[in-house]
Design a protein with these regions (language model features):
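Mature catalytic domains of secreted/periplasmic carbohydrate-active enzymes
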Residues: 1-414
Length: 414
């Protein structure tokens, strides 16, 4: 069996590599996560009152987009409507439960799309399929699905070309429920024929293949596994989405943040199997970007300044090594990118605490002939020996004053 060729818009999505997820809504005012309405069994009329204090006065779409861009993100996926049912966009009469009817009196998605366009970032729209707000979801599901379809139609018609739509919530009803996905996706293709369509399969079904119109499978809060595309009718991309702490929407008492090193490792290990990495940020009550979360993205950006070429242009390569070490091959076939984890540091034993090793690293199944290897961060040449399919490389440690979590070398091919 053969592997189907990727459609261009899907391969373009894969090349984006790294994106920012943004969860922001009425729930952000409470600071207890995006599921607070459900988890605390809140009365919906009381929850709706949060709309009366939603001013979005701190929301600066351009600042948000620049935070993503400076981190090396090529796209952003923003919650246009989450499970609470409140829309950040003008629903054009479908509902009064939206940002233009709040004290904000603004179409926040318009501002977001405009800022993305200005700074060369591809805008994606998250949209819930589950809705705790409208009674239609429980009482007249067919009518609800038409409301959902019309809502998505508004997003597809009114904001120019978008990168894609990221749906979430089909896991909320029993297996076999008819969500009328064909009709929903047909509407998208009518207005956005090259939009990436994602429908999150949730924590319990990572990587599951769904409707034929789906373009990418999801790995929520878990590192992706290699995709077996042999015999597939259509080439599918893959994407891991992850929080920087334990909540998607802001949790004001959640300080369990992942380290920059862990986030960088996850980005790299996503690219090892050809998956994108979608890392979340949760703005504050009125849209301000949290300084600590912004700083985390900033540190990733400093790493991406050195190694972004490998993240964007590298594709999975079958060479094997010890630990997490791996290789990617450039799209143009001119380079191998060698990712080295847990590298030690060069320094005085009285002050330097190294990683697991520095020295010789072996790779097997290296089918390409190499003419030279250098660290991408400083251009220093590395000694290596290649024999048949084996490569042994002397991975020199970090110079004192430098420690980058994952270090990448570039090997020029003959």
């Amino acid at each position: 069996m053969s592997i189907p060729k990727a459609k261009k818009y899907i391969s373009d999505f894969e090349q984006l590599g790294f994106g920012m997820f943004v969860h922001w809504g009425l729930y952000s005012q409470l600071g207890r996560g995006e599921w607070v309405c459900f988890m605390e069994n809140m009365n919906m009329p009381d929850y709706e009152k949060l709309m009366n204090t939603f001013t979005a006065e701190d929301f600066d779409a351009e600042k948000l987009v620049l935070t993503a861009k400076n981190a090396g993100c090529k796209y952003i996926t923003l919650t246009t409507r989450h499970h609470e049912g409140f829309s950040l966009y003008d629903t054009c009469g479908l509902s009064d439960f939206d940002a233009p009817h709040s004290p904000a009196k603004r179409d926040l998605i318009r501002e977001y799309v405009d800022a993305c366009s200005k700074h060369g970032i591809v805008p994606f729209f998250y949209h819930t399929t589950l809705d705790w707000h409208t009674p239609l979801f429980k009482n007249d599901f067919d009518a609800y699905l038409e409301y959902l379809r019309k809502s998505v139609e508004v997003l597809c018609k009114n904001y120019g070309k978008i990168g894609g739509l990221w749906f979430d919530g089909n896991w909320s009803k029993p297996e076999g429920t008819d969500w009328k996905e064909d009709e929903l996706y047909k509407t998208i293709r009518k207005y956005q024929p090259e939009a990436i369509i994602v429908n999150n399969t949730g924590l319990g079904a990572r990587g599951r293949v769904g409707n034929p119109e789906i373009d990418s499978v999801t790995f929520e809060q878990g590192r992706p596994t290699p995709m077996d595309r042999e015999g597939m009718e259509k080439y599918l991309a893959a994407e891991m989405c992850q929080t920087v702490n334990d909540h998607w929407g802001i949790g004001s008492r959640d300080i369990n943040y992942k380290s920059p090193k862990e986030l960088i490792e996850n980005l790299c290990l996503c690219r090892k199997v050809g998956a994108n990495y979608l890392l979340n940020i949760g703005p504050g009550a009125q849209g301000a970007v949290d300084p600590y979360q912004s700083a985390l993205f900033g540190l990733i950006g400093r790493w991406m300044e050195l190694y972004g070429e490998a993240i964007y242009n590298g594709r999975p390569y079958a060479a094997g090594s010890s630990g997490n070490n791996f290789m990617l091959k450039s799209v143009d076939g001119k380079y191998l990118y060698i990712f080295v984890f847990d590298l030690g540091a060069i320094g005085n034993a009285n002050v330097t605490v190294g990683g697991k090793y520095s020295g010789s690293i072996a790779f097997g199944n290296v089918k390409d002939e190499i003419k030279g290897i250098e660290w991408m961060d400083n251009g220093k040449k590395l000694e290596f020996v290649q024999s048949n399919d084996m490569l042994c490389m002397n991975a020199t440690g970090y110079e004192y004053g430098s420690s980058l979590g994952v270090r990448v070398a570039r090997a020029a091919l003959v």
